[in-house]
């Protein structure tokens, strides 16, 4: 049996061909409709007695259905241990003398629409929702139909936890939310997938050439890494798959998105259910698990369950 021999010249030829193919496919796709994303400038003031410190940053994004307006007020937390404000009778620990206040709510547990409505019914002038634990500085524009009369922005988990812990320590926190810059999403998902495939293919041929031309000495570390990769693939294959269909609650536009790609779930989407019961698009989570082995939300290791 003879195998194709990959040489640097072959690699260059293949890469050039792939580039021409990508340009052809790029020009073949119909124009995608641009979708505006508005950032939010947050002027945050921390007051302890007579000591006041402030910080200003473009640290949030407006929700897709939020009015683009300036709003300000003292920050109030949901009462009780749970900070997601999913219970319809949730109260907020706001100062009585405050004329205007903003609800700080944790993402998760229910839809964005429900959280915002709970805060609005309690008299909030705006809602700040901070992302899941473990998402670091990631934010995205929320979908919350039916709440178009109240300003709603998302901030990162890191910034949300900073404000939360400050208030829990007795710090008086006020926030001014102002409209930031507009960004357009001109690139369609098809083109994103195309360039992802193109980059992965070129990287494969490049690394393959390097691998073939570099002397290799087998060692225990290499064998161990190969065994772990094999174990991860087996563990992934044993995880449950599910095809979403009309009527599933995950298809509600107000439900949480896939945290890997931030796309909403649609009928016929194939999702992978992890042992921790979190689920994601199969096409998104499989590469993630191969690289990280852990759930992107709770860090559950699929090899330890």
Curated annotation (Swiss-Prot):
Zinc finger region(s), RING-type: 258-299
Keyword Membrane (UniProt): yes
GO molecular function, one term: ubiquitin protein ligase activity
Location in the cell: Membrane
GO terms classed as biological process: ubiquitin-dependent protein catabolic process
Glycan attachment positions: 43
SUPFAM superfamilies with a match to the protein in the record: PA domain, RING/U-box
Signal sequence bounds: 1-34
Entry's transmembrane regions: 185-207
Paired cysteines (S-S): none
CDD domains: PA_GRAIL_like (cd02122), RING-H2_RNF128-like (cd16802)
GO CC terms in record: cytoplasm; endoplasmic reticulum; Golgi apparatus; late endosome; membrane
Name by which UniProt lists this protein: RING finger protein 148
């Amino acid at each position: 049996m003879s195998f194709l021999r990959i040489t640097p010249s072959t690699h260059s030829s293949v890469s050039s061909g792939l580039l021409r193919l990508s340009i052809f496919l790029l020009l073949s796709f119909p124009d995608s409709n641009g979708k505006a994303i508005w950032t939010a400038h947050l002027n945050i003031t921390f007051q302890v007695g007579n000591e006041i410190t402030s910080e200003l940053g473009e640290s949030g994004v407006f929700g897709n259905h939020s009015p683009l307006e300036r709003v300000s007020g003292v920050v109030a937390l949901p009462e009780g241990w749970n900070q997601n404000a999913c219970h319809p009778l949730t109260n907020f620990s706001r100062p009585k003398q405050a004329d205007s206040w903003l609800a700080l709510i944790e993402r998760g547990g229910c839809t964005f629409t429900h959280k915002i409505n709970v805060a609005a019914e309690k008299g909030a002038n705006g809602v700040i929702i901070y992302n899941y634990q473990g998402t670091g500085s990631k934010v995205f524009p929320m979908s919350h139909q039916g709440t178009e009369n109240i300003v709603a922005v998302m901030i990162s988990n890191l910034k949300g936890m900073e404000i939360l812990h400050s208030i829990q320590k007795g710090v008086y926190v006020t926030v001014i939310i102002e409209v930031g810059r507009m960004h357009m999403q001109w690139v369609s998902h098809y083109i994103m997938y195309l360039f992802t495939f193109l980059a992965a293919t070129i990287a494969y041929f490049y690394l393959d050439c390097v691998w073939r031309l570099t002397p290799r000495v087998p060692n225990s570390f290499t064998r161990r890494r190969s065994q772990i990769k094999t174990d991860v693939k087996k563990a992934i294959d044993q995880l449950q798959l599910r095809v979403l269909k009309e009527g599933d609650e995950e298809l509600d536009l107000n439900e949480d998105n896939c945290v890997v790609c931030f796309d909403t779930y649609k009928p016929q989407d194939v999702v992978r259910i992890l042992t921790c019961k979190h689920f994601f698009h199969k096409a998104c989570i499989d590469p993630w698990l191969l690289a990280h082995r852990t759930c992107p939300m709770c860090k559950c290791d699929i090899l330890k369950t």
